[in-house]
């Protein structure tokens, strides 16, 4: 069985794991949205502590929607989203499109981009102070830049473009109308997504310089839940090696009424949101601080997020697996291993708290929004060293065995109805070698056993008459290049593919390759090569698809080399190879004031489209949210919509549909 191990072990781990290390013949080991809006490759920027706050005068930026009038936000900077921090403000547009979008300050249009996904139609204005404001999900660009874009579209014969401009090409004044608001790209409804970035492309909180008079906020953040989690193998919370979640029964709750028992190294987690006046949207917090017995332990401020690589690090800032399985977004109030962000202020423990037996710890959490509204939370931890007490229950009639992995700890849970006749120990096996684990504690009728996997991976786990195979093939450390190969696949991990150590789990069955679980997150892409067990006949129309739990398939692609196909992925999950031989569908649904086509594809999805009118190219715009292709108005460059026309659409597999029309 292939394995990967790190070269050294800290003294504490060695003392815990040495017996099994020697038994197995192993050497001791240790453990270390938003999509990008440009095709340019960036190297992740290293974190070096909290970033300096840019000096911007209060009132320098104009609110770009309805300036001078009361307005509302649909989302604030730093909201916790799957795979990204929300990078700016979502400004409401009265539920409609085509509101004027004003330049927030003097500067010049430095860039624009069009896409059916992500930011949609997006404009960038660079200002004399070096900052850039970003305006996303636009419906239309206005002014001379719109004409330059249209010429480029016809020159390249494609709608989606990215253009960069010099300082003197398209200057703008503060308050100049530069675009009309929209609902393009990944938007779920009409609004303006507005960002402020610095010269290094860090996303900055636009509210950090005094806010805007148009946006009022007198509402303090609201606590939804907090949690205490064991972070070391000897740690317990309420006597167990489990995260304990505490949900207030009344709102607001500022003092938790019950003392929480704990021991060992623990971390605090928080679920909370903020609201603005007269708006029901749940927004993010700007700052969270933690003090223990009056001394600072941890703080973070979401005013500066590196883009694009830093924003995906939200998956390490929150408990990603808990969010995926329990639907509750808990942000860690400690800096977890592999978290590259620089928005934290901590001491040497990085926000972790070591709880000792018999001592009391008063924990104060302070939640703040960008307008200075504050909500406190206070709770008490009391140190209680765990002790093993044997329990029995007549409710369990047969032995049972299951296991799970939390960080580096293997947690074995075994039901033992009769400890008098059966051994109370669980056994880890590797070949002919074995290690007996004594129970760490019991809960109801179950024994719980804890083992640090950095000491070596077992082949199987035995309890009484039950033996189960341990289905993790290798330990993959983060921070290094690592490879894994078997008869069905190859995996290639880069130095920044993983946030932290991975205990690799792969399988192949009935044409489906499973790599880990989607409950776990990747930082940068993982390279995979799939090795089909039979020859794939039509490779030109066959590709890799991500298969969800309900059997739905999403196109991934891949490059064929012989009978193997390689691709990159940002997600774990189930992958299959499928062949798409059916062309896309297209239907003309409107001629009024232009052409509107409804398009669809049964598997791989739309790849390209082209409309020729009288043999000349005519621009079409694609909107994936409602699966339509349509002509834009005005369009003074393309041919008029009269006479014979041909629409040609192609899917990702190369299947083509041609429709001839007489306009």
Question: Predicted regions span which residues?
Answer:
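Bacterial N-terminal signal peptides
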Residues: 17-27
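Proteolytic processing hotspots in large secreted/extracellular or virion-associated proteins
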Residues: 476-478, 498-545
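Long, low-complexity serine/threonine/glycine- and acidic-rich segments characteristic of extracellular
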Residues: 173, 216, 231-234, 239-387, ...
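Surface-exposed, glycine-biased beta-strand/turn segments
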Residues: 34-132, 141-144, 158-168, 173-174, ...
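Short beta-strand elements
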Residues: 373-390, 465-487, 659-663
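C-terminal beta-strand-rich structural cap/linker in extracellular carbohydrate-active enzymes
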Residues: 453-464, 564-583
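Proline-enriched interdomain boundary motifs that mark the N-terminal boundary
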Residues: 220-225, 388-397, 582-588
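Short edge beta-strand/loop segments characteristic of extracellular beta-sandwich folds
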Residues: 269-273, 410-417, 529-533, 594-602
């Amino acid at each position: 069985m292939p394995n990967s191990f790190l070269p050294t072990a800290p003294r504490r781990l060695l003392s815990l794991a040495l017996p099994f290390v020697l038994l197995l013949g192993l050497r001791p080991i240790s453990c270390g949205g938003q999509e990008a809006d440009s095709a340019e490759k960036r190297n992740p920027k290293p974190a070096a502590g909290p970033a300096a706050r840019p000096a911007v005068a209060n009132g320098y930026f104009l609110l770009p929607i309805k300036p001078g009038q009361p307005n509302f936000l649909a989302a604030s900077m730093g909201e916790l989203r799957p795979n990204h921090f929300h990078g700016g403000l979502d400004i409401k547009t009265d539920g409609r499109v085509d509101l004027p979008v004003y330049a927030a300050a003097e500067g010049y249009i430095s860039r624009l981009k069009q896409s059916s996904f992500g930011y949609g139609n997006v404009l960038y204005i660079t200002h004399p102070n070096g900052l850039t404001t970003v305006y996303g999900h636009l419906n239309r660009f206005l002014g001379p830049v719109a004409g330059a874009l249209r010429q480029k579209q016809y020159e390249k014969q494609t709608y989606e473009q990215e253009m960069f401009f010099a300082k003197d090409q398209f200057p703008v004044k503060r308050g100049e109308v530069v675009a009309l608001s929209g609902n393009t790209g990944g938007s779920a409804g009409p609004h303006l997504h507005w960002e402020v970035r610095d010269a290094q492309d860090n996303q900055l909180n636009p509210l950090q310089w005094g806010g805007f008079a148009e946006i009022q906020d007198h509402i303090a953040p609201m606590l939804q839940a907090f949690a205490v989690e064991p972070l070391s193998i000897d740690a317990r919370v309420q006597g167990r090696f489990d995260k304990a979640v505490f949900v207030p029964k009344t709102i607001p709750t500022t003092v938790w009424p019950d003392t929480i028992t704990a021991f060992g190294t623990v971390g605090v987690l928080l679920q909370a949101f903020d609201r603005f006046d007269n708006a029901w949207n749940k927004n993010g917090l700007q700052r969270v601080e933690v003090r223990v017995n009056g001394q600072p332990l941890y703080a973070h401020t979401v005013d500066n997020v590196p883009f694009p690589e830093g924003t995906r690090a939200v998956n390490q800032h929150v408990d990603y697996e808990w969010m995926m399985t329990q639907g509750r977004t808990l942000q860690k109030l400690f800096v977890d291993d592999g978290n590259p962000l620089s928005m934290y202020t901590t001491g040497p423990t990085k926000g972790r708290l070591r709880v000792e037996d018999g001592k009391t710890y008063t924990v104060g959490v302070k939640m703040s929004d960008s307008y200075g509204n504050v909500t406190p939370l206070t709770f008490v931890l009391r140190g209680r060293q765990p002790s093993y007490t044997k329990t029995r229950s007549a409710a369990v009639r047969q032995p049972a065995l299951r296991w799970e992995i939390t960080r580096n700890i293997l947690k074995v849970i075994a039901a033992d109805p009769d400890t008098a006749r059966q051994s109370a120990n669980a056994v880890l096996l590797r070949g002919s070698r074995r290690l007996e684990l004594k129970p760490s504690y019991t809960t109801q009728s179950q024994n719980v056993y804890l083992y640090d996997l950095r000491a070596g991976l077992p082949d199987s786990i035995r309890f009484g008459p039950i033996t189960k195979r341990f289905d993790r093939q290798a330990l993959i450390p983060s921070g290094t290049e690592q490879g894994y190969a078997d008869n069905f696949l190859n995996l290639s991990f880069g130095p920044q593919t993983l946030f932290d150590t991975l205990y690799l789990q792969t399988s192949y069955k009935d044409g489906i390759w499973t790599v880990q679980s989607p409950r776990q997150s990747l930082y940068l892409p993982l390279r995979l090569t799939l090795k089909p067990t039979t020859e794939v006949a039509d490779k030109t129309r066959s590709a890799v698809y991500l298969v969800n739990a309900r059997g739905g398939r999403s196109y991934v692609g891949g490059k064929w080399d012989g009978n193997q196909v390689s691709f990159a992925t940002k997600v774990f999950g189930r992958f299959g190879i499928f062949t798409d031989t059916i062309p896309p569908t297209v239907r003309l649904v409107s001629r009024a004031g232009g052409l509107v086509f409804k398009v669809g594809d049964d598997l791989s999805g739309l790849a390209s489209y082209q409309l020729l009118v009288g043999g000349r190219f005519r621009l079409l715009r694609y909107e994936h949210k409602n699966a339509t292709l349509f002509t834009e108005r005005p369009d003074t460059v393309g041919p008029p919509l009269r006479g014979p026309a041909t629409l040609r659409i192609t899917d990702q597999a190369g299947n083509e549909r041609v429709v001839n029309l007489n306009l």
